[in-house]
């Protein structure tokens, strides 16, 4: 069964600008490595919307990256690249 919406504002719209967050171990250069990996997988990064924040204990870092994806395949590939990194604990 396929679910479709009559309203275009529902769900993902492609092409579009999206944001992914990844949390991983601090001190592993994830702040620079994760954007580089996304760029390599073919998505266009929104450079001014890349940010990171360290946890209160300093043990973890959350990296937030905005990017443009042409289609769902490109979006899914970007998400997978982040998930595949050995230092990434989880993604949103």
Curated annotation (Swiss-Prot):
Pfam families: DUF493. SUPFAM superfamilies: YbeD/HP0495-like (SSF117991). Coiled coil: none annotated. InterPro entries: UPF0250_YbeD-like, YbeD-like_sf. Belongs to the UPF0250 family. NCBIfam families: PRK00907.1. This is UPF0250 protein XF_1271. It comes from Xylella fastidiosa (strain 9a5c).
């Amino acid at each position: 069964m396929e679910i479709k919406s009559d309203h275009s504002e529902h769900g993902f719209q492609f092409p579009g600008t999206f944001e992914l967050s990844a949390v991983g171990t601090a001190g592993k250069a994830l702040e620079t490595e994760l954007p580089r990996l996304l760029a390599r997988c073919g998505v266009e990064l929104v450079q001014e919307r890349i940010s990171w924040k360290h946890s209160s204990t300093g043990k973890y870092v959350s990296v937030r990256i905005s990017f443009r994806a042409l289609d769902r395949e490109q979006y899914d590939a970007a998400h997978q690249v982040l998930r595949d990194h050995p230092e990434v604990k989880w993604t949103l």
